[in-house]
């Protein structure tokens, strides 16, 4: 078949597909309304936004946040909810653990009056609610906290001690098959918080695994591994918060396996000022001499905590430092952006 005949055959096939399945059911990626832009929601930690490579968590995708207990999973998810609301978006929180603290969420910056919350009885109800919210097209982010607490209905109705092999994994697999396409169409970000377990009898390699089977690993565009690596000491004998290290374990939108560190303070959540200060020092925007921090010809203060408090008060300086960090780190092109440029360079037939 020569080239003109191949084109005619393709055009006929496209016309039939559009007639059968509707306009826009198939299109050239570089033409029409096929968008290359990825809308994101900031995480609240600039270092993590940079590690993700796209400036935050993507809309229309599934994101998994997993880690040990008290590592900051819920705090990170709540910051994403707060940032989505600040952008004028709508957020929903499916609290399967029945453990959301409204006062802490409010302290972080979430608008609890406008936050939609659901505390379903079983896993099937939770996932159905998530799908219906996504299908509405009016919700920007849905947090499911957590996968481990999504109890299948048959397990809930049975007795303690009954064996239910692979029941939760099958439930997750079935739900995610339906949810993925709905999220993409509605541009809703679904954040699944997950716990870790240990495999029995593993002598070599990492014995840790996440609950809910393999489906969530496959369907997630981004997987964030979050860990507590130390305590932040106060002036007295008490701790101010935790030092957190995050690894991007999977990333379909930018290079994976990047890491980021930031502080989670007990009275305010993720310390944006501390995060910006660390990045400014790392990129030689702020000079650190001994315990003193200098910016251009100005002394910011002595000691990291004192400078962090000063930056919290001086919003103008904080924004200036953030702007300079973003200029210095002018992020490398994402996979999508590289593909867009490649398509633009191709000759038009």
Curated annotation (Swiss-Prot):
InterPro entries: AAA+_ATPase, DNA_recomb/repair_RecA, DNA_recomb/repair_RecA_CS, P-loop_NTPase, RecA-like_C, RecA-like_N, RecA_ATP-bd, RecA_C_sf. SMART domains: AAA. PROSITE patterns: RECA_1, RECA_2, RECA_3. Pfam families: RecA (PF00154), RecA_C (PF21096). One of its GO terms (cellular component) is cytosol. The keyword Transmembrane does not apply. It comes from the Bacteria. GO terms for molecular function: ATP binding; ATP hydrolysis activity; ATP-dependent DNA damage sensor activity; damaged DNA binding; single-stranded DNA binding. It is found in: Cytoplasm. Keywords: ATP-binding, Cytoplasm, DNA damage, DNA recombination, DNA repair, DNA-binding, Nucleotide-binding, SOS response. The keyword Ion transport does not apply. Coiled coil: none annotated. Its main location: cytoplasm. Can catalyze the hydrolysis of ATP in the presence of single-stranded DNA, the ATP-dependent uptake of single-stranded DNA by duplex DNA, and the ATP-dependent hybridization of homologous single-stranded DNAs. It interacts with LexA causing its activation and leading to its autocatalytic cleavage. Belongs to the RecA family. This is Protein RecA.
